[in-house]
């Protein structure tokens, strides 16, 4: 019967929850992620180029960028509660994954720490002078994968 010939394109999507180790593996290579935070003008989401460094997410931004201005509170060791999202999707196959990291963002002040981060290879997304280094310390990591079920539902 024609209805029995299920292809990957017609299969129903399956959502799988990912454990923390799977999430860490997916984001370990670095790349582009999105930082979400409450800025001066309300909820804000911006793309940044990040790397994983010593179990944390690090990226660079400009001193006078919206993100840089929102994170510089004038209070030493201040932290901002943030969400950081990384994903990979395929419009063609309608499959992909996403990882959500929730935690606190801190400006990195220590020159030794900044030098260590530079060694990790983090480069700004937009290029140009990005003198602020931001570290996101995860308090919760979650993720999910969406894939097409194969014949027989699995």
Where are these regions (language model features)?
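Extreme N-terminal tail/first-helix region
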Residues: 1-28
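N-terminal short leaders/motifs
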Residues: 1-7, 42-45, 52-57, 86-92
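Charged, gly/pro-rich active-site loop segments
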Residues: 4-13, 82-154
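Short connector loops at helix/strand junctions that flank enzyme active sites
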Residues: 28-30, 45, 52-54, 76-81, ...
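Short beta-strand segments
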Residues: 30-63
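Short acidic/glycine-rich loop or secondary-structure boundary segments that cap or lie
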Residues: 45, 58-60, 67-70, 93-94, ...
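Compact nucleic-acid interaction/catalytic patches
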Residues: 53-75, 82
